[in-house]
Amino acid sequence: TEKERFAGAVATYTMEAMMRDGKSLQSGTSHYLGQNFAKAFNIEYQSNEGGLQTAYTTSFGVSTRLIGAIIMTHGDERGLVFPPVIAPTQCVIVPIAARKAGVIEACEALKKDLEGAGIRVTLDSTDNSPGWKFNEWEMKGVPVRIELGPRDIEAGKMLCARRDTLEKVEMPLENAVESVKALLATVQKDMLDAARKRRDSRIVYADDMAG
């Protein structure tokens, strides 16, 4: 509207993103400034004919508000839910019965393999209980959590938990890198599909002014 137009601009356009609760968040703006600011600051350019002309300028962009948009679009009551592509930590490894022989070593080896494949991974070797760690990393929105304990190592498997659906699935340790990569790709796609579905379910087409 005229009241929302950037002061001094000829026209202002905005991009409104729909959040999880159906509310909108202004995620980007584009202002056509015409020659108003160029005249004020004496901004000129040389035309093809050789003369000086006053420039037509714009101002546009997105900002840190997109971080808020991501949180509000995907987050839930448990905390953050980051899409894997932008997650600071894509995968966290939580040792189970960490003091048992070979557990930490197996977790460190898995971490090294995942890092070698370009996956952003953290090994939580703190003294907190597994339950505490689960809640903490869920709150931080890490897309995939790997639980690895003595029984898992003996069986040659690992338990992977998705942050977006909280679903748990067993995967073979032998193909850990490929399995985690595939799971991250699935989480990324499913989160995008879910966000689009929520958006589309709230779109109403108005063909006339009635009602």
Write out the residue ranges for each language-model feature.
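NTP/phosphate- and nucleic-acid-binding module
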Residues: 1-211
